[in-house]
Curated annotation (Swiss-Prot):
The keyword Repeat does not apply. It comes from Bos taurus (Bovine). It comes from the Eukaryota. A motif (Cx9C motif 2) lies at residues 219-229. Residues 1-22, 34-86, 109-132 are annotated as: Disordered. A motif (Cx9C motif 1) lies at residues 198-208. Belongs to the MICOS complex subunit Mic19 family. Metazoan Mic25 subfamily. Residues 195-236 form the CHCH domain. The lineage of its organism: Eukaryota, Metazoa, Chordata, Craniata, Vertebrata. The modification Phosphoserine is found at S13, S31. One of its GO terms (biological process) is cristae formation. One of its GO terms (cellular component) is MICOS complex. This is MICOS complex subunit MIC25. The gene is CHCHD6. Component of the MICOS complex, a large protein complex of the mitochondrial inner membrane that plays crucial roles in the maintenance of crista junctions, inner membrane architecture, and formation of contact sites to the outer membrane. Residues 48-58 have a biased composition (Low complexity).
Amino acid sequence: MGSAESREGRRASFGMDEEERVRVLQGIRLSENVVNRMKEPGQPSRVGLLAPPAAALGPSGGREKDSKPPRPDCGSGRGPPRVQVDPLERCDWEQAVLQDELVRVATTEREAAASPRSVTLRRGEGGVDQEKQRLAQRARELESQEEELRCRDAFYKEQLGRLERQNLEAYRLSSQQFHEAATKIEGAIKPRRVEPVCSGLQAQILRCYRDRLQEVLLCADLVRAYQHCVSSAHKG
């Protein structure tokens, strides 16, 4: 379980519970005792000589005779003899290391996942501030445009009133001048008395025609006298 062959031949798979604790390792759910031991810092590893179990020697004792004890390398100067770690302790140690690595990876992932949100929030706040500034600037521009329109409206109203007053004054002056000129011309023209020409002869001719309807030729002398009178009036 803790040997190099086991580590190279099997891959560790893990799962985390709601408290972010590793509970599954290589398909095996960890117990509370193992988790507690993984949490304890600085736990000394129990190292001792690993004696082969009695079952591994077999029923016959011939192998004990053939097997030779290992010779210590006293003269080599390479240090103390090699010791073998208890597989259970080695498994616990590997699980503790794996637990620390998983916690570190989970923490790193949480920080990496949280940093874009914080950056996005800061960017969002900056965007909101920029939008507020843009709206405030637009409001000031609209207020300035409205003020300019009010000034122009007042100016045009004043100019229109001035033009109306000028036109009214010009109309009154023109009307007064017209009446004065008409009165002056009427005074300069002399009236003439018109009387009908040869009115007496005209009345006699009309009476003659009424009295002598059947003898109108008898009125010829009066007609000639009326024509002579009219011709004289034209000449005179």
